[in-house]
Amino acid sequence: MALQGISVVELSGLAPGPFCAMVLADFGARVVRVDRPGSRYDVSRLGRGKRSLVLDLKQPRGAAVLRRLCKRSDVLLEPFRRGVMEKLQLGPEILQRENPRLIYARLSGFGQSGSFCRLAGHDINYLALSGVLSKIGRSGENPYAPLNLLADFAGGGLMCALGIIMALFDRTRTGKGQVIDANMVEGTAYLSSFLWKTQKLSLWEAPRGQNMLDGGAPFYTTYRTADGEFMAVGAIEPQFYELLIKGLGLKSDELPNQMSMDDWPEMKKKFADVFAEKTKAEWCQIFDGTDACVTPVLTFEEVVHHDHNKERGSFITSEEQDVSPRPAPLLLNTPAIPSFKRDPFIGEHTEEILEEFGFSREEIYQLNSDKIIESNKVKASL
């Protein structure tokens, strides 16, 4: 696998960090997740392919344990606000002095500098500060919070994984690690580069929800079907639009020009009436195999059984019969080989990991006795 041999230490946090580390694990990295004592959940979320160690970083001896781990690791991933790691004597100046090859990835909401860097926030706040939230929503309505995919996972976790991989590549030339300041505000803003670069085009001249790509166009939106399901339409190009009109049983010469924005509301109503006449399955029979850019809106239950996804093996099933997406992208020479085992219990591998990093049995016993670490072998055997 592409990242085979790379050792990652992930400090537990909310979803963006675990996702970032899972991506690295899926592509071959050995990921140790450092969980906090008394964690709320027995099982790590987004823990595929990882091992879990419970360590109290608030105690100086716990911080010393992490320093030993980082001396023999390639990457440290930390999800805290500015100043937290420095307060624990675990800042990049210390850890990279002890291991100059260490890549120190900092994944936060607002970044390591600026007036918001020490403030709390969530996906919707990062979207708001990036400007992207102002573009999301229906005409005449408030901007609405989409699923927390855009800032947390795309602008945060995935962008951080990209930064780590670029830093690993740079290290092959320089021999040195570096600090990565990945944050969800700037990551999301970067994802919106197309919006920024096209602001002066007519593409975005109308208010939110009335433009071609934000639900304003009748040929780029969703429609309810007779059975209460939905079809997604994205027939932008004229040749695809003609196939849409044909599939709907309409005639182009009886409709306004496709790009007549003044007529879009009436056209949407007409299209909605037509889509409401047939079920989702019936519309699939009409549009499947065509270039009309019309597809069913699938639920999580349906997507696994869709022919295209089954043919490509786009979803995988774990030993516990949990279904999740196959890692992407598909590398033909060094594809990801995700773990099919269950996610680890919190602290399941504490002693095993410490032994691998050179801790003696006596040291591990003492750390356990002093509540610096926790080992949950009993839970793991249930």
From Swiss-Prot:
Impact noted for substituting residue 52 to P: In AMACRD and CBAS4; inactive enzyme
PTM annotation (N6-acetyllysine): residues: 58, 87
Catalytic activity from the UniProt record: a (2S)-2-methylacyl-CoA = a (2R)-2-methylacyl-CoA; (25R)-3alpha,7alpha,12alpha-trihydroxy-5beta-cholestan-26-oyl-CoA = (25S)-3alpha,7alpha,12alpha-trihydroxy-5beta-cholestan-26-oyl-CoA; (2R,6)-dimethylheptanoyl-CoA = (2S,6)-dimethylheptanoyl-CoA
Enzyme class: isomerase
Main subcellular location: other
Active-site residues, as the UniProt record annotates them: 122, 152
Modified residues (N6-succinyllysine): 87, 268
Annotated binding of substrate, by residue: 36, 55-58, 121-126
Noted pH dependence of activity: Optimum pH is 7-8.
Motif annotated as Microbody targeting signal, chain positions: 380-382
Pfam families: CoA_transf_3
Enzyme Commission number, as recorded: 5.1.99.4
Cell compartments where the protein resides: Peroxisome; Mitochondrion
Effect of residue 107 to P: In CBAS4; inactive enzyme
UniProt keywords, alphabetically: Acetylation, Disease variant, Intrahepatic cholestasis, Isomerase, Mitochondrion, Peroxisome
Subunit structure: Monomer.
Name of the protein in its database record: Alpha-methylacyl-CoA racemase
Organism listed in the record: Homo sapiens
Lineage: Eukaryota, Metazoa, Chordata, Craniata, Vertebrata
